[in-house]
Design a protein with these regions (language model features):
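Conserved internal helical-beta-strand scaffold that buttresses enzyme catalytic cores
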Residues: 2-247
C-alpha cells in the first residue's frame, strides 16, 4: 500500500522506490505535515503502546516515549564519515571506505521494514523559500521519528517547494529500527553522496537525521564546497504563563 506521493521530482521518486524495494515495508506513507495526519499518528502510537499520553491538564500535548535500555545515547564508535579519501573525514571522525560500508550495511537493510510502515518525510532545514534552506528526505519505520521531525524541522509537502520538480540537491536519509541490535548499530554519513544511513537504533540523536547527521556532519561538507560554515546550536524560547517569550 503506497499513499500518493507529494512530489513529481523524479530523483526523489526513484530514490524512495529503491529504498522501498530494499527494506520491503508493508505500507508506504508520505508525510504531508498536516495536523490531521500528525494527530492520527499520535493516536496510533498511543494505541499501540509505543507512546504514553501524559496528564493533559499538567502537560498538554505531551507524550512519553522510551527506547530500549541498550539504546539511550549516541554511539561514537559506530558513527562513521565515509568519503573516498580518509583525510577528508577529519582527525576526530571514524572512517571507512564508502563501498565497503555499503556492502556491509545493505544486507542489514534488506527486508528490515517487513511488517512495518515506511514513512517518507520531506523536510527543510531553514525557512521555506529561503535561499539558505537545505532540503532533506528521510525514510523511516518509526512514528517517533515522524513526530519529532515535525518539531525540529519544517516538515511536510512545503519542503518540496524549495526543492522543485527537477533538483537532485537533497539529503537522502535512510533509517530503520531493524532489530535494535547494538552489535549491528551504525550511523553513517556519505558526504559525497549527500546521504545518511542509520540502522538498529530508535534513539533520537541516532535517528532524527536532520539533527547531528545533516545539520553538523553533512552540512560541514556542503559548507566547505559552497563557502559557508555549519554552526550547530539551539535557540530556546521560554514562554511565561502571561504569554511573554524570552529567547536564549
Amino acid at each position: 500500500i503506497i499513499t500518493m506521493s507529494l512530489t513529481k521530482n523524479p530523483n526523489v521518486l526513484k530514490w524512495v522506490e529503491e529504498m522501498t524495494a530494499l527494506t520491503k515495508p508493508d505500507k508506504v506513507v508520505w508525510i504531508d505535515g498536516s495536523k490531521e495526519q500528525i494527530d492520527a499518528l499520535k493516536a496510533e502510537a498511543i494505541s499501540t503502546g509505543e507512546m504514553i499520553e501524559l496528564n493533559q491538564e499538567k502537560l498538554p500535548g505531551c507524550l512519553y516515549h522510551r527506547t530500549l535500555p541498550n539504546d539511550v545515547a549516541r554511539v561514537e564508535d559506530r558513527t562513521f564519515i565515509c568519503c573516498k579519501n580518509k583525510e577528508d573525514a577529519g582527525p576526530t571522525n571514524n572512517w571507512m571506505d564508502p563501498d565497503e560500508m555499503k556492502a556491509m550495511l545493505t544486507p542489514m537493510y534488506d527486508g528490515a521494514m517487513k511488517g512495518r510502515t515506511m514513512y517518507v518525510i520531506p523536510y527543510s532545514m531553514g525557512p521555506i523559500g529561503s535561499p539558505l534552506a537545505k532540503v532533506g528526505v528521510e525514510v523511516t519505520d518509526s512514528i517517533y521519528v515522524v513526530l519529532n521531525m515535525n518539531i525540529m524541522t519544517r516538515m511536510g509537502k512545503q519542503a518540496f517547494e524549495n526543492l522543485g520538480d527537477e533538483s537532485n540537491d537533497f539529503v537522502r536519509g535512510l533509517h530503520s529500527k531493524a532489530d535494535v541490535d547494538p552489535e549491528k548499530r551504525y550511523i553513517v554519513q556519505f558526504p559525497e553522496d549527500n546521504a545518511i544511513w542509520s540502522i538498529n537504533s530508535a534513539y533520537g540523536g541516532n535517528v532524527l537525521l536532520g539533527k547531528k547527521c545533516f545539520a553538523l556532519r553533512i552540512a560541514s561538507y556542503q559548507g566547505k564546497n559552497e563557502g559557508w560554515m555549519a554552526e550547530h546550536m539551539l535557540i530556546l524560547g521560554v514562554k511565561k504563563p502571561d504569554g511573554e517569550v524570552k529567547y536564549i
